[in-house]
C-alpha cells in the first residue's frame, strides 16, 4: 500500500501578496446547501434492507410516479440514500453550475457507477436554491487495508447541480464595506490600512482590530470600482505554514520546511522518536533514510536524530513503513496536539 505524499516548497519569508489573498469582503461569502436524495444503478453495492429510510424513500419515489409498492416488499440493493451538499457562491446566478458532494447515509458499500436522482438543495431558510442530478464517480479508488482512506461511499461531482434561485444582493448600494482577514494579525491589518490610505491619497481604510479593516469609498468611485482596486493592492505578508491531508485519496501536502520538535509518540504499533541526541548511525535492521532518520520495519520504529526534522521527513518514513492514511492522519494530529508541529493541520 502506498500513500501519495506531495512536498511543496512554500516560502516562509516575507513576500508580496494581493489583499484579496489574505482578506475577505464581509457579506460576500458562500452559502451552504443540503439535500436528501437517492443514488440508483449500483451493482449490488447499495443499502441493504436494514436501512429502512432507503426502502421508504424508494416507495415514496415510485408512489410519486403512480406506482404503489410496500417498503417491506423492496429487496433491491442497487439504491443508496445519500446526503448532497454544495456551496452557493456569492452573486451566483440562475443556471450557474455548482460542484456537489454526495455522501452515503446507510450501509451502502460503494456509490461508484451510480446515478444521483433529482435532488433539491436547500439553504438554512428552507428554500430551494439548486437542483442536483448526475452520474457518480469516486475517482476509481480501490479500498485499502486498515482503513486506508479510500472513501467509495462519498464522491464529489463537478458541476452536478444547477442554481435555480439567487440570493438577493445589494452590493452596489452598500455603504458599509469591511475587510475581514482570513488569519487574524495586527500587523497585516495595519499594513492594509497604511497601503490603502497611501494609494488613494486619503483615509479610506481604518484597522479596527487584528481581523477587521473598515473601508470608506471615495465619492468618485462605485463600490465595484473601489473594491476592485482595493483587493488588487500588494502588501508584505508572511503566510502561516500548513499541512493538508486528503483523507479520501491519501494525499499529504506539506511545505518541506514545516519543522517538528523533539517528541516521542506511539500510535498502534508505530513508534516515532525525534531526539537530536539519538545515535547517528543505523542500528541492526534499520534503514538509513539519508536525512538524519532511520526506519526499522521489524519494530515499526522511526528514529530521527536531526534537530530540525520536518513533516516531509516523517511522512516519507511512514510511507516506507507502509502506514495507512488513517495512521498518518492520527500521527499528525497527535504531533499537533503535543505542540511538536508549528503549522495548521487541515484534514479534507
Curated annotation (Swiss-Prot):
Organism: Campylobacter jejuni subsp. jejuni serotype O:6 (strain 81116 / NCTC 11828)
Name by which UniProt lists this protein: Flagellar P-ring protein
Subcellular location(s) of the protein: Periplasm; Bacterial flagellum basal body
GO BP term, pick one: bacterial-type flagellum-dependent cell motility
GN (gene name): flgI
MF-aspect GO terms: structural molecule activity
InterPro entries registered for this protein in UniProt: Flag_FlgI
Domain of life: Bacteria
Cellular-component GO terms for this entry: bacterial-type flagellum basal body, distal rod, P ring; outer membrane-bounded periplasmic space
Amino acid at each position: 500500500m502506498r500513500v501519495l505524499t506531495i512536498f511543496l516548497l512554500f516560502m516562509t519569508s516575507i513576500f508580496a501578496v494581493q489583499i484579496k489573498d489574505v482578506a475577505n469582503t464581509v457579506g460576500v461569502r458562500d452559502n451552504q446547501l443540503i439535500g436528501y436524495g437517492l443514488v440508483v444503478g449500483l451493482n449490488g453495492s447499495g443499502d441493504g434492507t436494514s436501512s429502512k429510510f432507503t426502502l421508504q424513500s424508494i416507495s415514496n419515489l415510485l408512489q410519486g410516479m403512480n406506482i404503489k409498492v410496500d417498503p417491506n416488499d423492496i429487496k433491491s440493493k442497487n439504491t443508496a440514500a445519500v446526503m448532497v451538499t454544495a456551496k452557493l457562491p456569492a452573486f451566483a446566478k440562475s443556471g450557474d453550475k455548482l460542484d456537489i458532494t454526495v455522501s452515503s447515509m446507510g450501509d451502502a458499500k460503494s456509490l461508484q457507477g451510480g446515478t444521483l436522482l433529482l435532488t433539491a438543495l436547500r439553504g438554512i431558510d428552507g428554500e430551494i436554491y439548486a437542483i442536483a442530478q448526475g452520474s457518480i464517480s469516486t475517482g476509481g479508488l480501490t479500498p485499502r487495508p486498515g482503513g486506508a482512506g479510500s472513501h467509495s461511499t462519498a464522491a464529489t461531482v463537478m458541476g452536478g447541480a444547477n442554481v435555480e434561485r439567487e440570493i438577493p444582493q445589494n452590493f452596489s448600494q452598500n455603504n458599509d464595506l469591511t475587510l475581514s482577514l482570513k488569519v487574524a494579525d495586527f500587523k497585516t491589518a495595519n499594513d492594509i490600512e497604511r497601503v490603502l490610505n497611501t494609494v488613494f491619497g486619503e483615509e479610506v481604510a481604518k484597522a479596527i482590530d487584528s481581523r477587521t479593516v473598515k473601508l470608506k469609498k471615495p465619492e468618485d468611485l462605485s463600490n465595484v470600482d473601489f473594491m476592485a482596486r482595493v483587493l488588487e493592492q500588494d502588501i508584505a505578508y508572511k503566510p502561516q505554514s500548513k499541512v493538508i491531508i486528503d483523507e479520501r485519496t491519501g494525499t499529504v501536502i506539506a511545505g518541506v520546511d514545516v519543522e517538528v520538535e523533539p517528541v516521542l509518540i506511539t500510535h498502534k504499533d508505530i513508534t516515532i522518536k525525534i531526539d537530536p541526541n539519538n545515535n547517528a548511525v543505523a542500528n541492526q535492521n534499520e534503514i538509513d533514510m539519508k536525512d538524519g532518520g532511520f526506519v526499522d520495519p521489524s519494530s515499526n520504529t522511526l528514529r530521527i536524530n536531526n534537530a530540525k526534522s520536518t513533516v516531509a521527513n516523517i511522512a516519507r518514513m511512514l510511507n516506507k513503513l507502509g502506514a495507512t492514511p488513517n495512521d498518518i492522519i492520527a500521527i499528525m494530529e497527535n504531533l499537533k496536539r503535543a505542540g511538536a508541529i508549528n503549522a495548521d493541520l487541515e484534514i479534507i
